[in-house]
From Swiss-Prot:
Pfam families: GlutR_dimer, GlutR_N, Shikimate_DH. It catalyses: (S)-4-amino-5-oxopentanoate + tRNA(Glu) + NADP(+) = L-glutamyl-tRNA(Glu) + NADPH + H(+). Its main location: plastid. This is Glutamyl-tRNA reductase 2, chloroplastic. Substrate binds at residues 142-145, 202, 207-209, 213. Keywords: Chlorophyll biosynthesis, Chloroplast, NADP, Oxidoreductase, Plastid, Porphyrin biosynthesis, Transit peptide. The gene is HEMA2. It comes from the Eukaryota. The lineage of its organism: Eukaryota, Viridiplantae, Streptophyta, Embryophyta, Tracheophyta. The record marks 192 as: Important for activity. Pathway: Porphyrin-containing compound metabolism; protoporphyrin-IX biosynthesis; 5-aminolevulinate from L-glutamyl-tRNA(Glu): step 1/2.
Length: 542
């Protein structure tokens, strides 16, 4: 590490017995201390000028110096530490990370606090990308999961920042989040999203609604700053995987959904003698509500009350042809509930629609037992948790659907292996595409470098030949120079390609990239990462 003190450049290094004296192009003499460097050492009672590049000095492999970063005037030593590769976390490759909670890892009591309505997905992406180590982001929030997908400039720092963001937003302590969270990186994160899209990670194996929700993430993210190339590419590929798995394995044939499982659960919990005469009420006529109505009709229900904010959504339900649907506005919810035996709730309300005090005042249900049945598949829940304390009701939420799903799951487990094979193939394709992005800046700058040389030499040649050169000859000379440049570029660029169709590993390709960066001084390597983090730090100080 180098700092200027009275014309003397001082280098700090970690202790090592070996050292080859550096020969530098700096005009100032170099002094080397064999001691650990700390933030206070960066100040050295003088202005910090940067960090000395190990590439420019012949050194022992065990002598550690850090690469040069040209700093803006006025940055403090701490800011230098944040924005340079002295920070060990910035030496990592940019990572895809998923952080979240789902039905397998956390109870609904936690998930509902973290739930993010669709309207808040775009501003949520903006908040996440404003964090120092987050470059891109996406939000997937359903009744069964709340997952944040990010492109992190540093795994460790990125995870810390996103976890703190989730804690601040939900009011859940970080320690509690860490007990229940899903935390996956790169290939594992990619595989997880592909399994989610294929319906393999759903409460109901193979259910189709999750694919529509993944599609909605892409639709909502279009044009949102922060939903950029890597994250959008990941989600678009996940949609391809979801479609392919369903087409090639038929894993969704005859499949349950959360809505169908809710209807079946209600059927199981009702006394057999009351099933045919039970009065049914559905609260909400959105996607989930319409599916509940559809499955009620499939089970033989021909009359129900639907409570919703507007009547248009109720009228749009296709299953209305042979069914008597009685629409009631939301203001009549308690009056309708007093006459209902089974109540399904499936709205996006952030606050409970039924409290303990409300339900306690309702008359007994008309079933054999007199108990009113609530099936709440909303997250956040529409039925307050305290309602289950009442002896006159039975309350079930989305987590209680597991017992219904278990029997259905066995029939499709054989298809999971086929689906995993497809997912494995698609992971390889996606990672080849993602890895190819690593070398794109180098390829572009290398082409531009060669083009500048070609154009300059062409101008010299044409000027020497005089102004009276026939146009045909000029075109021929230009084409010749282009041909030579392209043939010279072909070999190196082929060794920078990462399309998954050759035997070169990513490490080999990255080594080739670093070599070309060094040879032609393209500076597209770690400096890109450093610039991104530095820019975020500086924006945060304004």
């Amino acid at each position: 590490m180098a700092a200027a003190v009275g014309g003397l450049t001082t280098c700090f290094a970690r202790p090592t017995p070996e050292f080859i004296a550096p020969s530098t192009s700096y005009s100032a003499p170099v002094r080397v201390f064999f001691k650990p460097f700390k933030v206070r050492d960066l100040c050295c009672a003088g202005e910090v000028v940067g960090v000395l590049s190990a590439r420019s000095i012949p050194i022992s492999p065990r002598f550690e110096l850090i690469r040069l970063v040209r700093m803006q005037p006025g940055l403090s030593a701490l800011e230098l530490l944040k924005t340079s590769s002295v920070n060990r976390y910035t030496k990592e490759r940019i990572s895809i990370v998923v952080i979240g909670l789902n039905v397998h890892t956390a109870p609904v009591e936690l998930r509902e606090k973290l739930a993010i309505p669709e309207a808040q997905w775009p501003p949520g992406i903006g908040e996440l990308c404003a964090l120092n180590h987050i470059e891109e982001a996406a939000v997937l929030s359903t009744c069964n999961r709340i997952e944040i997908y990010v492109v992190a400039l540093s795994q460790h720092r990125g995870v810390k920042e996103v976890t703190e963001w989730m804690s601040k937003r939900s009011g859940i302590p970080i320690s509690e989040l860490c007990k229940h969270r899903v935390l996956l990186y790169n290939t594992d994160a990619t595989q997880h999203l592909f399994e989610v899209s294929a319906g393999l990670d759903s409460l109901v194996l193979g259910e189709g609604q999750i694919l529509a929700q993944v599609k909605h993430v892409v639709k909502t993210g279009q044009g949102v700053a922060g939903f950029d190339r890597k994250i959008s590419g990941l989600f678009k590929h996940a949609i391809t995987v979801g479609k392919r798995v369903r087409t090639e394995t038929n894993i969704s044939s005859g499949s349950f959904s959360v809505s169908s499982a809710a209807v079946e659960l209600a059927q199981k919990k009702l006394p057999e003698s009351s099933y045919a005469t039970a009065k049914v009420m559905v609260v909400g006529a959105g996607k989930m509500g319409k599916l509940v109505i559809k499955h009620l009709v499939a089970k033989g229900c021909r009359k129900m009350v639907v409570v919703n904010r507007t009547q248009d959504s109720v009228d749009a339900v296709e299953e209305l042809k042979d069914v008597e649907i009685i629409y009631k506005p939301l203001s009549k919810i308690l009056a309708c509930a007093s006459e209902a035996d089974v109540i399904f709730t499936c709205t996006a309300s952030k606050t409970p629609l039924f409290t303990k005090e409300h339900v306690a005042m309702l008359p007994p249900a008309g079933t054999e037992t007199g108990r009113r049945l609530f099936v709440d598949i909303s997250v956040p829940r529409n039925v307050e948790q305290r309602v289950s304390d009442l002896e006159t009701v039975s309350v079930f939420n989305v987590d209680d659907l597991k017992e219904v799903v278990a029997a259905n799951k066995e029939d499709r487990l054989k298809k999971v292996q086929e689906a995993q094979s497809i997912i494995g193939e698609e992971i390889n394709k996606f990672e080849a595409w993602r890895d190819s992005l690593e070398t794109v800046p180098t390829i572009k700058k290398f082409r531009a470098y060669v083009e500048r040389i070609r154009a300059a030499e062409l101008d010299k040649c044409l000027s020497k030949m005089g102004e009276d050169i026939p146009k045909k000859k000029k075109v021929a000379i230009n084409d010749l120079s282009l041909g030579i440049a392209n043939k010279l570029l072909h070999g190196p660029i082929q060794h920078l390609r990462c399309d998954g169709n050759d035997s070169r590993t990513l490490d080999e390709i990255l080594q080739n990239m670093h070599a070309i960066n060094r040879m032609f001084d393209l500076e597209t390597d770690l400096s890109v990462l450093e610039e991104k983090i530095r820019a975020k730090v500086e924006r945060g100080q304004k």
